[in-house]
Design a protein with these regions (language model features):
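Non-catalytic terminal/accessory segments
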Residues: 1-495
Length: 495
């Protein structure tokens, strides 16, 4: 199950994830623990403090007192925090079961926020089920998408800001998914740096099967209570977990899993995997590994690099056993142990094997290669299946815009292609991006020819149109080692 925003063209308009100038907050590499201390109460001073000042105090308390359970956080869900959350939401998102859109709520914002704040603090706020919707997947299947109601989004966004002040001090350095100041490219940089700088010969690419649908509510709440002792916050999270979904007026209960795609879902997922995987994996590496181990996790997608094959095999068995204790399993087809690294080609050749194996992570195929001087070089190329799916989505998009003028089609294609290039234009991937632009040009040429049998759109004319409307291909990201070192001069990759 997913909660999301039901935006059109979501398959083909990639987010702008080029150089992120913000540094990630520091993290503590330690296990979470219960405590019974109560942080200083802030109600007397909150009227004279901004929301950022209050969160800074929570952040500092979480950093200084590692075992503290925060018992007074709910009062930080102020009218100011709720209004700021509302203003941060997408204005074009689809409505949930309540039928309320952003612009509708904004017409009487102060009154609506005051009423929501009153219901929250009087205990009469009720979470709404997600409105069930289906979106196509790259493999042709459909993925269920739950559209949350607007007020649920508002409260979740405000609470996530508060809880992040606590948990960003706890999460491990190798955890990258959906965290403030961290992006997919930061995870890719960390992995690339670890593979290049560290002696890695084996890569375990692990995917947790149906993770968001299999999260145990009981275990999740127990994990949250390691740090959060405010029962009003706990009750609020329980409401969202059990709100269920609604499809064509029929309500469905949710006895397990998190509302994937909801504003709060990524944080809940990170909390769950922090206790189930991150702390355990870090401890296993320190106690049992006989060689180098590099780890990077982005949500439920995990890549671990090993120096020795025996470590990789032992870790895989131990990981499967660990996940099973908490109701999770690894996907049998998407989890692979790959021979990889600077010695992979030589070692495989000595055994009569073929070229070194590859693995996929966050949209890129990672390849063991060599530079012109014969030294090991990590090559990253856009996954062919993902590019094929994107081109198909562009073809469908052009079909929907059949009768648009050429400038209207050109503006749409420019936005789509630029979004794709923003993510995929990394060093070494220029040839794939050039092919992508050529394929898009050809799709546009064919679309123009089909809409009129008398259209004489030749390759020459199509290339002229592409020169006007489509962005030129160029490398938009620095080398991963350079960017990782600039962001984390003292941190080891995959630490």
């Amino acid at each position: 199950m997913m909660y999301g925003e039901e935006k059109s063209d979501s398959l083909i308009v990639a987010a702008n994830l080029a150089n992120n100038p913000q540094g990630a907050e520091s993290v503590e590499r330690r296990s979470g623990a219960k405590g019974n201390a109560e942080q200083p109460h802030m109600r007397r001073t909150q009227s004279r403090e901004s929301m950022s000042q209050r969160l800074s105090r929570v952040r500092e308390a979480a950093k200084q007192r590692k075992k503290e359970r925060f018992t007074a956080l709910f009062h930080l869900l102020t009218a100011e925090a709720l209004e700021n959350a509302f203003l941060s939401l997408s204005r074009k998102a689809a409505a949930g079961v309540d039928g309320v859109r952003w612009k509708d709520y904004a017409e009487n914002l102060k009154v609506n926020i005051a009423d929501l704040h009153r219901r929250l603090h009087q205990g009469s706020y009720r979470a709404q089920p997600g409105r069930w919707h289906y979106i196509p997947k790259a493999d042709g299947k459909q993925r269920p998408l739950g559209i949350a109601s607007l007020e649920d989004k508002i409260v979740q966004y405000a609470l996530v800001k508060i809880l992040n002040a606590v948990y960003e001090n706890d999460f491990m350095g190798f955890s990258y998914g959906f965290r403030p100041g961290r992006s997919q490219h930061n995870a890719l940089d960390a992995l690339a740096t670890g593979l290049v700088r560290t002696n890695v010969n084996w890569v375990l690419d692990a995917d947790i099967s149906q993770f968001f649908d299999k999260v145990s509510h009981e275990w999740l709440i127990r994990f949250i209570e390691h740090r959060i002792g405010d029962q009003r916050v706990i009750r609020l999270i329980r409401k969202w977990l059990t709100a269920g979904t609604s499809e064509e007026g029929e309500w469905r209960a949710s006895e397990e899993g998190t509302p994937q795609g909801a504003v709060i879902s990524p944080l809940l997922a990170n909390i769950y995997l922090h206790y189930v995987f991150d702390l355990w994996a870090h401890q296993w590496r320190r106690r049992h590994a006989t060689g180098n181990v590099v780890m990077v996790r982005y949500a439920d997608d995990i890549v671990i690099g090993f120096d020795k094959r025996i470590d990789a095999q032992c870790f895989r068995i131990a990981m499967q056993r660990r996940l099973k204790e908490f109701g999770l399993t690894v996907h049998p087809k998407k989890t692979r142990l790959t021979e990889f690294g600077r010695f992979a080609a030589e070692n495989r050749a000595s055994r009569g094997k073929g070229k070194p194996e590859t693995f996929n992570f966050l949209g890129f195929t990672h390849i063991s290669g060599k530079d012109r001087s014969g030294r090991f070089m990590l090559i990253r190329k856009t996954r062919r299946d993902r590019m094929t799916a994107t081109l198909k989505a562009i073809k469908d998009g052009l079909r929907k815009r059949w009768h648009y003028s050429i400038p209207e089609q050109g503006k749409w294609l420019r936005r789509v292609v630029q979004g794709y290039l923003n993510y995929h234009s990394v060093p070494g991937n220029y040839p794939m991006m050039r092919k992508f632009r050529i394929y898009v040009t050809d799709l546009w040429r064919r679309a123009l020819r089909r809409r009129s049998q008398q259209d004489d759109t030749t390759w020459t004319k199509a290339n002229r149109l592409a020169a006007v409307w489509l962005p030129k291909v160029r490398v938009l990201h620095p080398w991963p080692v350079e960017r990782f070192t600039a962001r984390h001069p003292r941190q080891e990759p995959g630490a």
